Amino acid sequence: MLSFILSIFPIVLLIYLMVKRNALPSYVALPWVATLVMGVHLLHFNTDIVTISANVVSAIIAVQTPITVIFGAILFNRFSEISGATNIMRKWLGNINPNPVAQLMIIGWAFAFMIEGASGFGTPAAIAAPILVGLGFHPLKVAMLALIMNSVPVSFGAVGTPTWFGFGALKLSEDMILEIGSITAFIHSIAALIIPLLALRILVNWDDIRKNIVFIYISVLGCVVPYFLIAQVNYEFPSLVGGAIGLFISVWAANRNIGLAKVTNTLDNNAVSAGEVVKALFPTGLLIAFLIVTRIHQLPFKAMMNDATIWFSTTLGSLGLFEISKGLIFSLKNIFGSNVSSSYKLLYVPALIPFVITVLIAIPFFKISSSNVKQILVSSLQQSKNPFIALIGALVMVNLMLVGGEHSMVKIIGRTFAEISGSNWTIFSSFLGAIGSFFSGSNTVSNLTFGSVQLSTAETTGISVALVLALQSVGGAMGNMVCINNIVAVSSVLNISNQEGTIIKKTIIPMIIYGIIAALGALFLVPLFYNL
């Protein structure tokens, strides 16, 4: 029990430090909590200093993935502002329909749904949120909406990575993974009838939601129906294709004012020409095109960018073995002589491609001056500084909580919760997945971490394995709402300072409601449609 208390205490302390009255910013709280976890390892778990040091170095390498994505997104958004593309898009969207509910659903729901399907890595909020701020919505509230909306598609984000890769270590059959995907989509589809309304409520009142409810559900079902149907036969494309279909349906319905209350257009949006719109949409279109062609494994680019064949290798003394692969994967292996390794996929991580490359292509296209290019670069680097410190703290904490295999702090937390709940595990299963996402920043990592705990709990209690693993995946997705990495990412892209605790206090409520919906769906609705 002492091991459980010491394992969960850092998470409880982190939440307290970030939501108390005079909350600490994440770039202060996370390094302090990471230091505490280090102390627990040394004093209670008797972990050797080499293992701890190796995991700290590994975390510093691993942090390059989220921070370069954040930098790339900031760079792209700063470019969009300075080039005038954001302003043209704002006017164009205002002309499609000035109703704020329509704009929030098109960009915050359907567009983000599609981007999640292509990329994951927190990019939907990073791309969609600045567009909404450009339309005049409050940045802090937009951050909350973006986090809450980006939950339903997450289990099939980055072309299904949380499902097929997240559960890959469990060596499940193809049919079992497909069944897990099917049940996951079913539970998400139920939640999708309620969660977008809670997200909208942050920015508009219930009366406006009621007046526009027909359009809201056209947009929701436009994404969710194809998403659910595709998940019956495939676990890679539900979010990508569902989001694309839903985006088309949402824009079509908004253009015709279907299900929307008439509102006065308060935007300063003189009619923009088709040429201006095409030019303004060019960077975003290029961005999406890069994401899609580099994520679909039927095309050759994904394999090329993930090619692990060694191209260059050298020993860096006691630090470890440094390697560069043909796919430009930079790796440091056997750090300090341990079995700890870390890597950074320069081409595959959505940073250089698509964000930086898109900006480099678009700069001459928009004839941006050298002084403005310098301003874009300098402001992007400055905006990335605090998230970098916060994410080093987060990843050191995560790495150390995973040290010890079956006896790691994370596994102790998971097993203790499972033992306490016993046969009632269906009710709590999704919340374990959410805890995984909260501290790790990823549905995929949550599934990798807790998949084995969920599997053994299901087998011990006699609950359906497919159902429990589906709830794990749903939990990992809903945990995106409160996930530290995503909150840091969207805050930094929108240039919001020291509001992480405020965001968590708002987003944790819909996350808990999501978990309750998942539990009720698993107990009462899933058995009606699935032979468990």
Curated annotation (Swiss-Prot):
Coiled-coil regions listed in the entry: none
Keyword tags: Cell inner membrane, Cell membrane, Membrane, Transmembrane, Transmembrane helix, Transport
GO molecular function: lactate transmembrane transporter activity; solute:proton symporter activity
Any one Gene Ontology cellular component term annotated for this protein: plasma membrane
Main localization of the protein described in the UniProt heading: membrane
Transmembrane segments: 23-43, 56-76, 101-121, 129-149, 152-172, 180-200, 213-233, 234-254, 274-294, 346-366, 387-407, 420-440, 462-482, 508-528
Membrane topology listed for this record: Multi-pass membrane protein
Domain of life: Bacteria
Record localization: Cell inner membrane
Annotated function: May play a role in L-lactate transport.
Family: Belongs to the lactate permease family.
Name of the featured protein: Putative L-lactate permease
Organism this protein belongs to: Haemophilus influenzae (strain ATCC 51907 / DSM 11121 / KW20 / Rd)
